[in-house]
Amino acid sequence: MEDRFLKRLRKKARRGMRGWPLATVAFYGPNLSRASKVAVGIFTRENGDMEEIRDWKLDTGDVRTDPGIAREILEFMEAHGVLSVTMTDRIIGCPHQEGIDYEGEWCPVCDFWRGRDRFTGQIVQ
């Protein structure tokens, strides 16, 4: 049975736009099958900059199915009074950040993503 925190998070995302603040939930991983990182950004108004961002990572397992991470994400959203949630339906790239974790165009750790479009996973180069 699906954990209640995971269920609540998915339900919030399905509800659509309910007002501001808005939370964005994006999943990242070493490939298209395992999400090792989730990042949540908070926007307080339309066309505004992201006010805060937080991420969660796992060395093993998948962040999309971890009830503890789902609970912490919900608590983070509640602390910011989030009314709307948008969530990616797939992994959208490498969990490492260009310019922070590595220099250059492609992550040296995640060979899978080399030459791939981060949103589709399709090879572009």
State each model region's role.
Residues 1-77:
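Long, charged N-terminal interaction/targeting segments
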Residues 75-125:
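Cys/His-clustered metal-coordination modules, chiefly Zn-binding fingers
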